[in-house]
From Swiss-Prot:
Domain of life (superkingdom): Bacteria
Gene of this entry: cbbL
Listed EC numbers: 4.1.1.39
Species for this entry: Methylacidiphilum infernorum (isolate V4)
Entry's cofactor comment: Binds 1 Mg(2+) ion per subunit.
Residues the UniProt record annotates as site (Transition state stabilizer): K336
InterPro entries, per the entry: RuBisCO, RuBisCo_large_chain_AS, RuBisCO_lsu_C, RuBisCO_lsu_C_sf, RuBisCO_lsu_fd_N, RuBisCO_lsu_N_sf, RuBisCO_lsuI
Task performed by this protein: RuBisCO catalyzes two reactions: the carboxylation of D-ribulose 1,5-bisphosphate, the primary event in carbon dioxide fixation, as well as the oxidative fragmentation of the pentose substrate. Both reactions occur simultaneously and in competition at the same active site.
This protein's name: Ribulose bisphosphate carboxylase large chain
NCBIfam families recorded: PRK04208.1
Similarity comment: Belongs to the RuBisCO large chain family. Type I subfamily.
GO molecular function: magnesium ion binding; monooxygenase activity; ribulose-bisphosphate carboxylase activity
Oligomer and partners: Heterohexadecamer of 8 large chains and 8 small chains.
Positions carrying N6-carboxylysine: K204
UniProt: Mg(2+) binding residues: K204, D206, E207
Length: 486
């Protein structure tokens, strides 16, 4: 047996002979298969165990993520077996490594309509523990429009959010309240007020602030919304605070969401750790109730960061767009968190565009047609500050939320000054871009000139001018080119 032994299959048996038959011989590898428009396509990176042939390993992934088990079973004869089995139709080596990419097609009938939980259970639910593989990573998916249309998609989307807020032509600005844990509800609200009156559009609960003994959720929300309303009255702008509704049960999450709506909040938040079903459920509630939904990708790096095992974040981005979030954290390029330029730009394309072409440079293995589904607003947060504004706008574009937590609250002249510094930086950079200037090259000079009339910006740049997070990324694109499949 190829999977368990020395890589020599021996004499080929009948497909229906009792016992163990190599996955490739059972039809899970088919080099002649031409994927259908309606197939879900997957690209898996894998490292086989010694003695396991790459084609057999790819076939095993196709089998174990669809209909196969470890031995021949007679009940296969009671199904349209060839229709339902996953089909590995191509295996490519990754140059200079011991890794391979398996391209697998799944018939749409294998998946429940409109369910991220079912799709993820099918494709990644069991196969990642398979002993015949040293490692396995789901790199990308092509989700056909036929299946895309079974999902709600973003509760509102980028354009509707801008219309809600009446804010156009620039990135939106936010800040996560710091310290994330330990503040009283009243002091928490003071941070929100200072940041919003200083020029930010949003403030945010962090992923692990829910309802702890030092600050219960209801108390926090009352003070936060008082701060939001006061800042809106003073500035004449629509403002918001991401109220984190993540809780132990869906009943509690709905209770918190309803209270947020009662208080007049334009936005709520949920953590990725709440699970796919909870996220989809809250997205449906948000569309029904006219509330924006922010997703914090808490916990994602436990399975997205490593190069050879887990799930690439571009897959999570696709799933969350289908699930229906309006915002998702997707990397900064220049901040403290993992994400090289090309990977992050690939994530942003996945979230925002209506049609994405395959692009190996950005790590995009497949084309993706979103069938007019609204886009998701990517969020850049984690170790960014006003002095990087030219880089952020150049790399990430304007349909982005830039969140400066420490870069607002850590300002030497206080929270409002930190917010003002960020607002001035984005305004001058957008103006320069609109005037046709090369902001990537001229950005430092543009900021320096703005510092002459903005003491807040000058202090921010002076404080953080020497701060950088120049570490090599653990994951950069090396996609094996995948031809467009018509």
């Amino acid at each position: 047996m190829v999977i368990a032994g020395d890589g020599k299959a021996g004499a080929k048996k009948s497909r229906w002979s009792a016992g163990v038959t190599p996955y490739a011989e059972m039809g899970y590898y088919n080099a002649d298969y031409v994927p259908k428009d309606t197939d879900i396509l997957a690209a898996f990176r894998f490292v086989p165990q010694e003695g396991v042939e790459p084609i057999e390993a790819g076939a095993a992934v196709a089998g174990e993520s669809s209909t196969a088990t470890w031995t021949v079973v007679w009940t296969d004869r009671l199904t349209a077996y060839e229709h339902y089995q996953g089909k590995c139709f191509r295996v490519e080596p990754v140059p200079g490594t011991n890794q391979y990419i398996a391209f697998i097609a799944y018939d749409l009938d294998l998946f429940e309509e409109g369910s991220i939980a079912n799709m993820s259970s099918s494709i990644i639910g069991n196969v990642f523990g398979f002993k015949a593989l040293k490692s396995l990573r789901l790199e990308d998916l092509r989700i056909p429009p036929h299946y895309v249309k079974t999902f709600q998609g973003p509760a509102h989307g980028i354009m509707m959010e801008r219309e809600y807020l009446n804010k156009y032509g620039r990135p939106l600005l936010g800040a996560t309240v710091k310290p994330k844990l330990g503040l009283s509800a009243k002091n928490y609200g003071r941070v929100v007020y200072e940041a919003l009156r200083g020029g930010l559009d949003f403030t945010k609960d962090d992923e692990n602030i829910n309802s702890q003994p030092f600050m219960r959720w209801r108390d926090r929300w009352l003070f936060c919304m008082e701060a939001v309303n006061k800042a809106m009255a003073e500035t004449g702008e629509i403002k918001g605070h991401y109220l984190n509704v993540t809780a132990a049960t869906m009943e509690e999450m709905y209770e918190r969401a309803e209270f947020a709506k009662e208080l007049g909040s334009v936005i709520i938040m949920v953590d990725l750790t709440a699970g796919f079903t909870a996220i989809q459920s809250m997205a449906k509630w948000c569309r029904k109730n006219g509330v924006l939904l922010h997703l914090h990708r808490a916990g994602h790096s436990t399975y997205t960061r490593q190069k050879i095992h887990g799930v690439n974040f571009r897959v999570i981005a696709k799933w969350m767009r289908l699930a229906g979030v309006d915002h998702i954290h997707a990397g900064t390029v220049v901040g403290k968190l993992e994400g090289d330029l090309h990977s992050v730009q690939g994530y942003y394309k996945t979230l925002r565009t209506q049609y994405t072409e395959a692009d190996p440079l950005l790590g995009l293995y497949f084309e993706q047609d979103w069938a007019s589904m609204p886009g998701v607003m990517p969020v850049a947060s984690g170790g960014i500050h006003a002095g990087q504004m030219h880089l952020l706008l150049s790399y990430l574009g304007e349909d982005t939320i830039l969140q400066f937590g420490g870069g607002t609250i850590g300002h030497p002249d206080g929270i409002a000054a930190g917010a003002t510094a960020n607002r001035v930086a984005v305004e001058v950079m957008v103006q320069a871009r609109n005037e046709g200037k090369d902001i990537l090259r001229e950005g430092p000079e543009i900021l320096e000139k703005a510092c002459r009339w903005s003491p807040a910006l000058a202090k921010a740049i002076e404080t953080w001018k020497d701060i950088s997070f120049e570490f090599e990324s653990t994951d950069v694109p090396d996609a094996v080119a995948m031809p467009t499949i018509a």
